[in-house]
Amino acid sequence: MMPLSMVNGGEPSVIPKVGGKEEIRKFLETLGFVVGGTVTVVSENDGNLIVNVKDSRIAINQDMARHIMI
């Protein structure tokens, strides 16, 4: 397992764990980052990750990406 912030783009990955404080986990869940869900890193732009999750493209910063394990 490693944080999403360390992943190279292109390959879909299943999320086994979402860490952090409860408020951070809840926020990430509302964006679609749930255990068992699939996420694909599309690109990195100015320290932000562009990811596909639940048929949506979302930008998250490195701090949030560190809480999402794949």
Which residues does each predicted region cover?
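Compact, glycine-rich, soluble single-domain proteins
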Residues: 1-70
